[in-house]
């Protein structure tokens, strides 16, 4: 069962939903897709709730769907789990036994400017206890940056948070936690009806340098699974001893500090956004949402059979801020410059800020291509 929402629904997922006769909630997004010629199986609110009570598994495209769940879904256990995972401070408390040395605390927003900034253990991350995207998030390294962050929150946070319900972005409390140094990774997983976790994707989020915060490049490979799958799986098993999740998908971001994987945040009831999760479709031919809804457990041996030496990557190719509205992505040049472009998805809307997304494959002989991608000047790919 699917709830399709902005910002983006791929044609791959649409076709998967049609082929597998998946119930889709009737809303503005799904109706627009049907109007574009795709015969989705749409259910109104009452029909969708009734189907959920029979099927028991639900997938949402983004945080935008959470408001509908709160209003319509009579599954308080599920709603409580979502609320718990959305609350970053509560999540840190749950993980405290696993990470006893990790610093964090929670404060009322009105009390932030009264904190003795010179007593804090920098570097820190300051963010809403309940948040969405990067709204209200600040990385602070010293007292001056702390004071600047507090001023920004006081002046601008309520303007941003007012666009979302309290369930999506909380406005009362902020979490202060240690900044986690190390490489960034992400995992798509689901817990089956017995609470057993299955990992469907492991990504390495690569950056050009320490100041880079873009989503330009995510990579996956058999070597990545060999190195990190056990560590991530151990975390999931320990987490579910507390949460008791079942029939539940999630996307988790980690930092690996050289000794252990530390979770940054969890996104409940969905996998990686903007179709990053569909990298698995190119690796194994299986859509991860199908795997979750059909209870398919995929081993890394099955996933990477015959592709053990390859790296599969997902690219978000930003549209230059100064690109003219009539400029479009140069698909031919991009294909010529890359070893193996598996799929290219140009975005025509200049307001999105993304020129295209791409799925690519590289082998050992072309590893340098990935580093080159991190430094691409996107002006070279606009015509």
Residue ranges and their predicted role:
Residues 124-154, 184-188, 208-224:
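Glycine-rich phosphate-binding loop of ATP-grasp-fold ATP-dependent ligases
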Residues 240-277, 305-311, 315-323:
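Conserved metal-phosphate-binding beta-hairpin within the catalytic cores
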Residues 293-383:
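Peripheral (often C-terminal) accessory segments that flank ATP-dependent C-N-forming ligase machineries
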Residues 124, 198, 262-265:
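Protein kinase-like catalytic core scaffold
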Residues 1-37:
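Short, charged N-terminal beta->alpha structural module
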Residues 101, 143-181, 242, 380:
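Conserved ATP-binding module of the ATP-grasp superfamily
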Residues 178-181, 188-244, 267-296:
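ATP-dependent carboxylate/phosphate-activation module, predominantly the ATP-grasp catalytic core
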């Amino acid at each position: 069962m699917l709830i399709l929402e902005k910002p983006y629904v791929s044609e791959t997922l649409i076709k998967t939903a049609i082929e597998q006769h998946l119930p889709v909630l009737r809303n503005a997004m799904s109706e627009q897709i049907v109007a574009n010629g795709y015969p989705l199986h749409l259910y109104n609110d009452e029909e969708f709730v009734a189907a959920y009570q029979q099927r028991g598994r639900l997938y949402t495209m983004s945080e935008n769907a959470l408001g509908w769940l709160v209003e319509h879904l009579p599954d308080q256990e599920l709603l409580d789990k979502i609320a718990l995972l959305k609350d970053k401070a509560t999540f840190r408390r749950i993980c405290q036994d696993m990470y006893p040395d990790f610093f964090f605390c929670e404060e009322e927003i009105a009390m932030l400017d009264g904190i003795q900034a010179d007593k804090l253990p920098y570097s820190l991350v300051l963010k809403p206890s309940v948040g969405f995207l990067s709204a209200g998030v600040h990385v602070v390294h010293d007292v001056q940056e702390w004071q600047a962050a507090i001023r920004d929150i006081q002046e601008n946070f309520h303007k941003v948070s007012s666009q979302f319900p309290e369930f999506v972005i909380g406005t009362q409390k902020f979490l202060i936690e240690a900044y986690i140094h190390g490489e960034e990774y992400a995992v798509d997983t689901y817990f089956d009806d017995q609470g057993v976790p299955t990992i469907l994707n492991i990504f390495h989020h690569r950056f050009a340098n320490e100041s880079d915060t873009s989503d330009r490049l995510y990579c996956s490979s058999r070597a990545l699974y060999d190195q990190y799958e056990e560590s991530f799986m151990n975390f999931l098993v320990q987490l579910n001893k507390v949460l008791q999740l079942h029939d539940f998908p999630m996307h988790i971001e980690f930092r690996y500090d050289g000794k252990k994987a530390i979770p940054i945040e969890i996104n409940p009831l969905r996998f990686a956004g903007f179709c990053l999760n569909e990298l698995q479709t190119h690796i194994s031919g299986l859509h991860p949402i199908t795997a979750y809804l059909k209870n398919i457990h995929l081993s890394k041996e099955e996933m990477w059979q015959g592709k053990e030496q390859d790296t599969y990557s997902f690219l978000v190719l930003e549209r230059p801020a100064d690109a003219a509205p009539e400029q479009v992505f140069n698909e031919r040049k991009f294909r010529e410059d890359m070893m193996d472009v598996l799929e290219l998805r140009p975005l025509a809307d200049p307001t999105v800020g993304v020129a295209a997304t791409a799925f690519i494959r590289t082998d050992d002989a072309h590893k340098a291509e990935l580093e080159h991608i991190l430094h691409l000047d996107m002006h070279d790919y606009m015509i």
